[in-house]
Every structure is written in structure tokens, then in C-alpha cells.
Amino acid sequence: MTVSREELATKVDVIDWLTLRGHLERGGLVVVDPLLELAEVGAALAADDVKAVERWLSSGLLGKPSLAQVKEWDVDKAKAFLCLIVSPYVLIQEQTRVAG
């Protein structure tokens, strides 16, 4: 069964780092660069689009959280992320803070 990008877009939610931390422990977190849309990446994973996923991985637009990122996020456990679950993965994207 193929899940559409539009359908996945309705499933994107906001979640804090403290809640996501457990998914890091089991290895399910995948960081998505802000240049990509979570729903687009989720649809590619769900469709097993190996070419797109490999392209994003090789260009650094998609990957596991780095140790530096985890340390930074552990300091601010309330940090907000956009999140999309595409089992077994939890796709996350840092929310940018708007100055105001």
C-alpha cells in the first residue's frame, strides 16, 4: 500500500526532545534537513524509493542524529521538532525559532 505525500503531511506533528529521546535509544530517529519536506521524505521511505533516500543520505540531507546534535538537544529538552512516524522510523526536523 502506497501512502501519499499529502496524506503524510496531515500526520506531521510537533514534539519535544524529551519525548523523542527514547526513540534515539532504539535507533529509530532520522534527522531531515530543513531543505526537505518531512512528508516527501516519509513518502519516499514508505514507497521504498531507494534512489531518493540514497541521494539524500549521500548529500547529508538525511541521517542519524550526530553526537553533537544530541548533546545540544539534551541541554534543551523542551526543544521543539516537527515529527513524522513512518514505521520503523521517526523522522524529525528542527523547528526554527522565529525572532520577535
Question: What are these regions, as identified by a protein language model?
Answer:
Residues P34-L36, L57-L61, P88-V90:
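Generic secondary-structure microfeatures
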Residues K64-G100:
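Short, compact, well-ordered microdomains
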Residues E40-W73:
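Short, hydrophobic/π-rich interface segment
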Residues M1-A47:
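N-terminal, charge-rich interaction modules
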